[in-house]
Amino acid sequence: MSGLFLVGAAGATSASQAAPADEERAEPVVVGHRGAPGYRPEHTLASYELAYRQGADWVDVDLVPTKDGQLVARHENEIGGTTDVAAHPEFASRKTTKVIDGVPLTGWFTEDFTLAELKTLRATERIPDIRPDNKIYNGRWQIATYQEVLDLTKRLGRELHRTLGTYPEIKHSTYFASIGNPTEPKLVDLLGRNGLNKRNAPVIIQSFEVANLKALSKQVKVPLVQLTSATGAPADFVASGDKRTYADLATPAGLKEISTYADFLGPEKAQIIPRTAAGTLGTPTTLVKDAHDAGLKVVPYTFRNENSFLPTNLRSSADPSDWGNAFAELDAFLATGIDGLFADQPDTALVAVRS
């Protein structure tokens, strides 16, 4: 297990303490973002397994609840873009429009399906134009439950002789609480039943919202990650009339507040190195230093190899699906002192970290 987790877990009961000395800092950790979706459809057991086999010690598992209160791995509760649900006539009447975190969305939603119903669906590639090779896997794998991911993690840990862990992310917390189907109690219960609600357990909980993390800091013994974005505000802030934004959370004062309930900052990478008007990497901000000064570890998201996601000067061609100079981007961010990163191609990120 990497040093990042060990320091984070120790800080779970004292997140506001000073950052560790340089000599205590470990090799930056690579988290498989939704598994290894550069190679397999995201959030499938196959995607998670590949990430672990490529060398990632952690995988990012976004969680949303089903109608019958089970936690499944999906990036959002609308599943039209990542499953074959539209091809199931028996579910045609489930298509609807909802407002999720202030945004109208039309499609099919996990909270309207039982787990048994969701298990009849199959995962599909989210961005087939960018990752056409992944289309061959459409229809191969079911939607995974978090319990299934935990079981896979334990099994592969034994096989690979490594301690492997999960980064569960609570999606749309305020929304699910508003419809009487909150995620947090289900997650706390699941961790407890798996013996994972304890210090040094291989679990780190994430959220883009704040109130739920503050509450969880009193309910769990594992580290917490405050996720932030380069734009916008936490959904719970908007719902409660709090005028603060993610930019406010990224100030020294905001980071100090985060350190009272969380151990990690998970910023959008543009908050660390913004891009210029021309789309190239700009000048790094002070966010990494400021977060370290507040006693927080910094694990930004998301690094991807395809030209479509890279700075303009690091692209290899006009084809958005071609791989560009991902190493140059990774090297630039690693030079800022980040403690880890989320990557769609964990194998590439691990080469950057270790070379």
Regions found by a protein language model. Give the residues of each.
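Phosphate-group recognition and catalysis centered on beta-loop-alpha active-site segments
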Residues: 5-355
